Amino acid sequence: MENVSFSLDRTLWVFLLAMLGSTAGQPLGGESVCTARPLARYSITFTGKWSQTAFPKQYPLFRPPAQWSSLLGAAHSSDYSMWRKNEYVSNGLRDFAERGEAWALMKEIEAAGEKLQSVHAVFSAPAVPSGTGQTSAELEVHPRHSLVSFVVRIVPSPDWFVGIDSLDLCEGGRWKEQVVLDLYPHDAGTDSGFTFSSPNFATIPQDTVTEITASSPSHPANSFYYPRLKSLPPIAKVTFVRLRQSPRAFAPPSLDLASRGNEIVDSLSVPETPLDCEVSLWSSWGLCGGPCGKLGAKSRTRYVRVQPANNGTPCPELEEEAECAPDNCV
């Protein structure tokens, strides 16, 4: 069974937090500097919306069932990039996207904090053991390190993940109070598997990060291929809420109550993605049967490859007959 959660070594995390917290120097780039208050704390809540109703095709039910890896993120300046669409992923992110292994990615974050002084803090949240559910953490941002990036692996999958690339929580002279974003699947470009449970098949040469859509990759075998949809429903969402109190005295703010209410609405309004029936090609015609001198009948069959769901196109007839001249008549 695939290892769906990774163990983050406590000693390394303590070292990382201490090291990165002491390297809040000026960023090397020429980006505009945030003039908000020196520090801000946020709660981050990741909500999985990967349900069988919204994503019925090849939905993983066992070995392992649909779920999410731990969340791994960083608060940083523009000199650091955890991942970026249309660019190649690092070795660390490759390991995370393919196997959920975080060690190499954590070492890359550490190196960026030491050499470039571009990472202010790291944060993580526990894995979600089902396709739908929540996990949360807290993070700290700094005016010179106001960008946030994170990744969560889709489990099971070849190298698919969701995440945010360089979200700026600062807007001019103030910190944003709340940010809610829908998340969609991305392909890390390191494994060529088409389905959730595809065996390991390295992409050589490596490709860049691409967003997976209802029509791309344009192949019926792909687990996210829904040709009737213009776009996929969000597979997850993330909510950032600025915290007004110290972490020890933190109580869920009123915004959290609103978000819980939204979760109830979301659960009642889960999009029903139609899944059309798919059948095989016709078999060869069988032998023609019947008395000599009269018309006989022959038949051929096909079988269901994908059962329809959520009001998708029903399956056509699976057997067909035709008239014929009987075989072996002299």
From Swiss-Prot:
This protein's source sits in the domain of life called: Eukaryota
Q: Which gene encodes it?
A: Spon2
Q: Which residues bind a divalent metal cation?
A: E140
Disulfide bridge positions per record: C34-C170
Stated name of the protein: Spondin-2
Q: Which residues form the signal peptide?
A: 1-25
Any one GO CC term of this protein is:
extracellular matrix
Concerning SMART domains, the annotation shows: TSP1
- Main localization of the protein described in the UniProt heading: secreted
Concerning Pfam families, the annotation shows:
Spond_N, TSP1_spondin
Domain TSP type-1, which positions?
Answer: 276-330
Q: How does it assemble?
A: Monomer. Interacts with integrin.
Q: Which NCBIfam families match?
A: NF038123_dom
Record-linked PANTHER family: SPONDIN (PTHR11311), SPONDIN-2 (PTHR11311:SF15)
Please list the GO terms describing molecular function. Answer: antigen binding; lipopolysaccharide binding; metal ion binding; signaling receptor binding
Q: What processes in GO biological process is this protein linked to?
A: cell adhesion; cellular response to lipopolysaccharide; cellular response to platelet-derived growth factor stimulus; defense response to bacterium; defense response to fungus; defense response to virus; induction of bacterial agglutination; innate immune response
InterPro entries linked to this entry: Spondin/Thrombospondin_T1, Spondin_N, Spondin_N_sf, TSP1_rpt, TSP1_rpt_sf, TSP1_spondin_dom
Purpose of the protein: Cell adhesion protein that promotes adhesion and outgrowth of hippocampal embryonic neurons. Binds directly to bacteria and their components and functions as an opsonin for macrophage phagocytosis of bacteria. Essential in the initiation of the innate immune response and represents a unique pattern-recognition molecule in the ECM for microbial pathogens.
Keyword Glycoprotein listed: yes
UniProt lineage: Eukaryota, Metazoa, Chordata, Craniata, Vertebrata
Q: Keyword Calcium, does the record have it?
A: yes
